[in-house]
C-alpha cells in the first residue's frame, strides 16, 4: 500500500500524557500496514537539540528570549534534516512535539503563547496535516511521571503542568483532534489509527 502524498502528523500534550508512546506506536502500526512512516521528536538529537535538553534538565539557564530562539533554531534543523527530506522521499512523518509545545511551555506573563505561535508562523514552518492533542489532568500526568523516572525536568511540577495545559487550550487550532489521555495506550493508538485512515483513505492507492 502506498500513499500518493505523505502526511505530516504532530502529537502534542503535557509531560506524562502518553504522546511519545503514541507517536512511536502509531508509526509501527502504519509500517505494519505497508504505509511508509517515520517518527521524530523535538528537541532533536542534533547539537541544537542537545543544547535545549541541557536547559530542560536544569543544567543551564536561559532567558525567555534565548529559550525561544533556541527552539526556533532547533526546529529549523528538524525541518531541514528530518521532516522535509522524509516527506520528499514519500514517507509519512510523525512528530513528537512541535511549535505548539514551544508556545505552551515557554510562554509567560511577558510573552504570550499566541506571540510565540506567530514567531513560528513567520518562519514559514510547515503546518501539520493532522494535529493530535492528548489531554490529561496534570495531577494524573504528574503521578505517571513520578513512577517513570527519578530525575525531573524543570517543567514537571503540578503548577507548571496546569499552566502549560491552559496555554495549550488557548493556542491549539480548531482542527486539533483531542484525545482523552486517560484511556489505555492500546485504545488510544487504535483510535488515532482509525482517524488517520479515515481522513486520508482517499490518498491510498
Curated annotation (Swiss-Prot):
Catalysis performed (reactions): dTMP + ATP = dTDP + ADP
GO molecular function: ATP binding; dTMP kinase activity
EC number(s) stated in the UniProt entry for this protein: 2.7.4.9
Pfam families: Thymidylate_kin (PF02223)
GO CC annotation, single: cytosol
Positions with a binding annotation for ATP: 13-20
Name under which the protein is recorded: Thymidylate kinase
Organism: Leptospira borgpetersenii serovar Hardjo-bovis (strain JB197)
InterPro entries (UniProt xref): P-loop_NTPase, Thymidylate_kin-like_dom, Thymidylate_kin_CS, Thymidylate_kinase
Homology family: Belongs to the thymidylate kinase family.
Role according to the record: Phosphorylation of dTMP to form dTDP in both de novo and salvage pathways of dTTP synthesis.
Keywords per UniProt: ATP-binding, Kinase, Nucleotide biosynthesis, Nucleotide-binding, Transferase
Alphabetical GO biological process terms: dTDP biosynthetic process; dTTP biosynthetic process; dUDP biosynthetic process
Coiled-coil intervals: none
Amino acid at each position: 500500500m502506498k500513499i500518493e502524498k505523505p502526511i505530516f502528523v504532530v502529537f502534542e500534550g503535557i509531560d506524562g500524557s502518553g504522546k511519545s508512546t503514541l507517536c512511536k506506536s502509531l508509526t509501527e502500526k502504519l509500517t505494519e500496514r505497508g504505509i511508509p512512516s517515520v517518527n521524530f521528536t523535538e528537541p532533536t538529537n542534533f547539537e541544537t537539540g542537545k543544547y535545549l535538553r541541557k536547559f530542560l534538565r536544569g543544567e543551564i539557564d536561559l532567558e525567555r528570549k534565548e529559550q525561544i530562539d533556541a527552539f526556533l533554531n532547533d526546529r529549523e534543523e528538524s525541518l531541514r534534516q528530518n521532516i522535509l527530506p522524509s516527506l520528499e522521499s514519500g514517507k509519512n512523518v510523525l512528530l513528537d512535539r512541535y511549535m505548539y509545545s514551544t508556545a505552551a511551555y515557554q510562554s509567560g506573563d511577558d510573552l504570550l503563547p499566541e506571540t510565540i505561535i506567530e514567531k513560528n508562523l513567520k518562519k514559514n514552518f510547515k503546518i501539520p496535516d493532522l494535529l493530535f492533542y492528548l489531554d490529561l489532568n496534570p495531577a494524573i500526568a504528574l503521578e505517571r511521571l513520578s513512577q517513570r523516572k527519578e530525575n525531573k525536568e524543570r517543567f514537571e511540577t503540578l503548577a507548571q503542568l496546569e499552566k502549560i495545559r491552559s496555554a495549550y487550550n488557548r493556542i491549539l487550532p480548531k482542527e486539533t483532534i483531542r484525545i482523552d489521555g486517560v484511556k489505555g495506550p492500546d485504545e488510544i493508538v487504535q483510535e488515532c489509527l482509525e482517524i488517520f485512515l479515515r481522513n486520508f483513505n482517499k490518498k491510498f492507492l
